[in-house]
A protein has these predicted regions:
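Basic/polar phosphate-binding segments, predominantly the helix-turn-helix DNA-binding elements
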Residues: 60, 64-70, 89-140, 145, ...
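Short helix-capping/turn signature of helix-turn-helix
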Residues: 148-149
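An amphipathic alpha-helical interaction segment
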Residues: 2-96
């Protein structure tokens, strides 16, 4: 048995982490066995570059463990959504183009599904409706941009799909419980 945790560098990895399973139980995956063995050997050795090698091995171990936990057996979340080839197309479009004024019909078309089938399938797989996920993704991107303090609130609003700073400020305040300006100052 191997236990561990990951500390994600992104200050707002909460959305993605909340959509990952808390526990991944894997059996009979040879690649994982090899990686676990390598992690054990490297952690016992006192060689130069040990920390760098361990960091990379553990990153690969995480990816392989998550890959093995996808599909219908996975709990609702991002992995299950990405494991569905049709939903994955829509998710990648949302992630790649958060400023686009997506509609349910457009996302369903990307997934080659009817609106009702897309809504049902997405909600069942990801654990939340598509437009709720899109809002959460946009707010996650906005928080990251605000933390950097490189853009005005209006520029952040434009990058995450809002036509005006005031509309964005209202949506952000409702979602986050504070204004974008205040959020940026606190970081």
């Amino acid at each position: 048995m191997l236990g561990g945790y990951f500390d994600f560098a992104s200050p707002d990895a909460s959305l993605l982490v909340s959509l990952l399973p808390a526990l991944v139980h894997v059996r009979g995956v040879e690649r994982l066995s090899v990686l676990v063995r390598l992690v054990g050997e490297e952690s016992r050795a006192q060689r130069s570059g040990r920390e760098l090698v361990l960091t990379r091995l553990v990153e690969v171990l995480l990816v392989e463990a998550l890959r093995s936990a996808h599909g219908d057996d996975a709990p609702p979340g991002l992995l299950r959504g990405l494991a569905d080839a049709r939903l994955a197309v829509a998710i990648r479009h949302m992630h790649g183009h958060p400023a686009r004024p997506w509609t349910m019909a457009q996302l369903a078309k990307k997934a080659a599904l009817s609106r009702s089938a897309f809504f049902e399938r997405f909600t069942r797989a990801v654990g939340m409706p598509p437009m709720e996920y899109l809002l959460a993704w946009r707010m996650s991107v906005a928080k990251d941009l605000l933390r950097r303090n490189e853009l005005s609130v209006a520029e952040v609003a434009e990058r995450v799909g809002y036509g005006s700073a005031s509309t964005f400020s209202t949506a952000f305040s409702r979602y986050e419980g504070q204004s974008p300006g205040r959020f940026a100052r606190q970081r």
